[in-house]
A protein has these predicted regions:
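A secondary-structure boundary/capping signal
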Residues: 1, 27-28, 67-68, 100
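Conserved nucleotide-sugar donor-binding
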Residues: 46-51, 62-75
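The conserved acidic donor/metal-binding loop of glycosyltransferases
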Residues: 2-6
Length: 148
């Protein structure tokens, strides 16, 4: 969850209702309280990312997400990975669900995002994700008790 107070921890309860049936449950910021320009950038970036990943996720930037630990442990980490969390979870043959959550105007801090790091860098990261997806090996390490 972000520290800018644009979402509320209370909405985690909405996500937790479905975590038994899905490996990732994530929020979609309903009625976003951001500027027109920020919302436009987000729609463009999410649309392109969705086209490249085919994950169907509307709002990957929503900070409210809950996921199973076993899946979280298998995520490859890299700069900008947060944009691809749903796609990386889907590579593990998981199921995801998106749920509308509340969104509030920013009351604290300033955004660290601007045109360059909201559009250009994620654009390039999409190609890196596609490269990685072609080479991804979905595996699980089983428990093996050698000492009984």
């Amino acid at each position: 969850m972000d520290a800018d107070l644009q979402t509320t921890p209370e909405d985690f309860n909405l996500l937790l209702k479905d975590i038994a049936d899905y490996q990732l449950v994530m929020g979609i910021r309903a009625n976003r309280k951001d500027s027109f320009f920020k919302n436009l950038q987000s729609k463009i970036a999410n649309g392109f990312r969705r086209m490249m990943t085919h994950d169907g996720v509307q709002d990957t930037g929503c900070p409210l997400k809950v996921l199973h630990t076993a899946y979280a442990k298998r995520i490859p980490f890299f700069t900008g990975m947060h944009r691809f969390l749903p796609a990386l979870i889907l590579l593990q043959d998981a199921k995801i669900k998106q749920i509308p959550v509340r969104h509030f105007p920013r009351v604290a801090g300033t955004s660290k995002y601007h045109l360059w790091n909201r559009l250009v860098s994620p654009f390039l990261d999409c190609f890196a994700y596609r490269w990685m997806k072609k080479r991804y090996i979905n595996y699980r390490v089983g428990d093996n008790n050698l000492m009984e």
